Amino acid sequence: MSRALDRLAINQYGKLRFAKEFIFQKNADINVSNENRIWFLDAPAYGNLGDQAIAYAIREFCRKVLPDMEIVEFQEDKVIQYLSWLKGTIKAEDIIVLQGGGNLGNLYPRYEFVRRTVIKSFPHNRVIVFPQSVYFSNDRTGKQEAAAARESYAANKNLVIFARDSCSFREMEKEFPETHIELCPDIVFSLNGIVSVEKRSGIGV
């Protein structure tokens, strides 16, 4: 079954992969403030230390730059099943942040599907994708997925994607002409001292 899914376009893959979550939506049993909030909507749900370090750096950066805003975090494998609740809870003034790293493109279809879904679902919110590298395979599938990503990203005029290297920056500018692209080093470079990937505070699912 997984091999068959892997051959599908990312949008088809995601709808099948998360079919149960789309049908059986859940309400999050958490209390969030009425103040403006930062929603980290695709925190990694797996143990890769590099990606966990990036997630930690994102939290610390948000706390430092916007200390008065509450951070609410959902892991990437939980977003779809809480999507209806999120749509009813996230305010237009809230900021949505998405994971940095190297999962933008068609190499990691589950992550790309979740990212596209979030970006399209909140067209009026500022959405910030932290520094990413991009990869679309140099074949028909890669071209199709680049076009699908282009359409999804263009649906949100408040989207900003940060590229973490010059090659990715040029590629993103070419593939996503309607999206605001900026060049910025990997967010882990914003950390000082030793990174503890275990540290996590605030509200999360």
Which residues are covered by each model-predicted region?
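Helix-loop-beta element that forms the nucleotide-linked donor phosphate-binding surface
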Residues: F169-I187
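A short beta-strand/loop micro-motif in the catalytic core of glycosyltransferases
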Residues: G50, N158-D165
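Aromatic- and Gly/Pro-rich donor/ligand-binding loops
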Residues: S2-N156, E171-E173, V188-F189, G193-I194, ...
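Metal-ion/cofactor- or nucleotide/acyl-coenzyme-handling active-site neighborhoods
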Residues: L41, L159, L183
